[in-house]
Amino acid sequence: MNSLVALVLLGQIIGSTLSSQVRGDLECDDKEAKNWADDAVRYINEHKLHGHKQALNVIKNICVVPWNGDLVAVFLELNLLETECHVLDPTPVEKCTVRQQHNHAVEMDCDAKIMFNVETFKRDVFVKCHSTPDSVENVRRNCSKCPILLPPNNPHVVDSVEYVLNKHNEKLSGHIYEVLEISRGQHKYEPEAYYLEFVIVEINCTAQEAHDDHHQCHPYTAGEDHIAFCRSTVFRSHASLEKPKDEKFESNCVILDVKDGHAHSHLIQQHIEKNSISPEHNITILNFVHPDDHTSTSHESHEHVAEVPVVFVKKELPTDISDHHTTPVKGCPGKVHHFKLY
């Protein structure tokens, strides 16, 4: 009898958990809505190939629609903010600092659709995002001398990164690095300087070979990779036309051993032999479909990312993602977790 009661109670618990996941009357600040939004943000950060991780800022809208059979479609409109963690950084996004307005913040608006199977708990995620930096006018309105964001391919930014890299390679005996990606550059004032964020990777060359245009240098194979996240400031004038030679600079690079199977180890291969300049803002940066084969509803474990390399399929998003017009929902948009850019 006790076993039967326990079985009934277990069924009620499972049923309650399942029904909470597929509620159709969600408001944007409901816990269930936050769980769906966290799912979408997690996938964005796990599969974003360039730049920095994103943090949830506002759930702008949510709509849960019954689909075919056991499928439920969850449509989300999200506003995210750029953090200071690069996408290759293993730090959980919850522990990443959101880039503040005085440091020229960048926001990202995303349309997401999660197809959820209530029987198998499988999720198919479709995401389309567009990032936009805060306007220069807004930054200067509150802080006239705050650093201004520059395109990562700005000549001063590129030259300054190469200058710092050469200085590092001179000091690191037996270890030579090359730029994997320039993810941020800013023009600073008083004193005038260039602030840089970039990622470097160790290569299988000597210093002499690295300067030989005829010698092919490559990053080490998976499991032997050493990458470093660098934040540097090079003090030089915007009017300088020559490449930096003896300018003062400050730099801090955190070196990370990349383990084979690390959640983002496959992304390093995406960077190798590619353009080392991060894509500029104001463009759609994500357009992917990724199936999730979880067999439970847990939001904690995502080891499958490390076990199986993700295959990206270039395809048009279903029209019902960006063209799905969700009617305004009571309680939406939700609260602002950080700040709004205007």
From Swiss-Prot:
The keyword Cell inner membrane does not apply. Disulfide bonds join C28-C332, C85-C96, C110-C129, C143-C146, C205-C217, C230-C253. Expressed by the liver. PROSITE patterns: CYSTATIN_FETUIN_A, FETUIN_1, FETUIN_2. The record marks R140, R141 as: Cleavage. Residues 22-130, 141-254 form the Cystatin fetuin-A-type domain. Residues 1-19 form the signal peptide. A motif (Cell attachment site) lies at residues 23-25. This is Antihemorrhagic factor HSF. Keywords: Disulfide bond, Glycoprotein, Metalloenzyme inhibitor, Metalloprotease inhibitor, Protease inhibitor, Repeat, Secreted, Signal. It is found in: Secreted. Is highly stable to extreme pH and heating, stability that may be conferred by the disulfide bond between Cys-28 and Cys-332. GO terms for molecular function: cysteine-type endopeptidase inhibitor activity. It holds the Pfam family Cystatin. InterPro entries: Cystatin_dom, Cystatin_Fetuin_A, Cystatin_sf, Kininogen_Fetuin_HRG, Prot_inh_fetuin_CS. Cys-63 may exist in a mixed disulfide form with a thiol compound such as glutathione. One of its GO terms (cellular component) is extracellular matrix. Residues 24-108 are annotated as: Indispensable for metalloproteinase inhibition. Inhibits hemorrhagic and proteolytic activities of metalloproteinases (HR1A, HR1B, HR2a, HR2b and H2 proteinase from T.flavodidis and brevilysins H3, H4, H6 and L4 from A.halys brevicaudus). Has no effect on brevilysins H2. Has no effect on papain and cathepsin-B. The keyword Secreted applies. Glycans are attached at N142, N204, N282. Belongs to the fetuin family.
